[in-house]
Design a protein with these regions (language model features):
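Single conserved hydrophobic/aromatic residue that forms the stacking wall/gate
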Residues: 1-9, 13-14
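Hydrophobic hinge/microswitch elements
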Residues: 11, 15-20, 25-26, 76-130
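Beta-alpha-beta core module
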Residues: 31-38, 42, 104-152
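Flexible hinge/capping segments at coil-to-helix
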Residues: 32-70, 155-158
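Active-site-adjacent beta-strand anchor residues
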Residues: 47, 72-73, 99, 117, ...
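Secondary-structure junction motif
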Residues: 54-55, 68-90, 153-161, 171
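Periplasmic-binding protein-like
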Residues: 166-173
Length: 173
């Protein structure tokens, strides 16, 4: 995440002439040139298809969950997901069997395979995916809206920031 912080921060500083208006990311760049606000927060669950073996286990353990084959969704070409970083901190690792780059396809993959997906509760509910709780403490998923401080007083920027913030609030319902 340090490298990403550096890249996003550098990118926004380079583009401080209204070329880049917003970034939404779980990482807040460390820079005096950047402002941010939290727009999304949700807990993680483990999604599966309707008749998956995991749905038959009452109160699945972390080992029950980690024994499954997992789908990893990330727009980044490589690297760990936030959930993997947190699992690694407590000595656990997922068995990632498939990686895809967008969440739009993830529900179809989960509904038609034995794979499971660690993702947010709101995503599971919005896509009508059955899920089980993760029986260990994992920090909440947080996303931040990030912008260059030079855009702070711009009326169009304020309007767009408000639209983005409301869209994320609607997504959590």
């Amino acid at each position: 995440y340090e490298m990403l912080r550096s890249l996003v921060g550098s990118e926004m500083c380079i583009r401080d002439r209204n070329n880049l208006d917003f970034v939404v990311d779980p990482v807040i760049p460390r820079s005096d040139e950047i402002n941010s606000m939290k727009v999304f927060e949700d807990d993680f669950v483990v999604m599966h298809r309707e008749d998956h073996d995991l749905s038959k286990v009452k109160n699945p353990s972390i080992d029950d969950i980690l024994d499954q084959k997992h789908l990893h969704v990330s727009g980044r070409k490589r690297g760990l997901h936030l959930i993997d970083v947190e699992l690694d901190k407590v000595g656990y690792r997922r068995k990632v069997a498939l990686r895809c780059q967008h969440f739009l396809i993830a529900p179809r993959i989960i509904q038609s395979t034995d794979l499971v997906l660690m993702g947010t509760r709101s995503f599971a509910k919005r896509n009508d995916l059955p899920f089980v709780e993760i029986p260990i403490e994992i920090p909440l998923m947080e996303y931040f809206l990030i912008w260059h401080k030079n855009d702070e007083g711009d009326g169009g920027h304020i309007w767009m920031k408000d639209l983005i913030e409301r869209a994320f609030k609607d997504a959590q319902r």
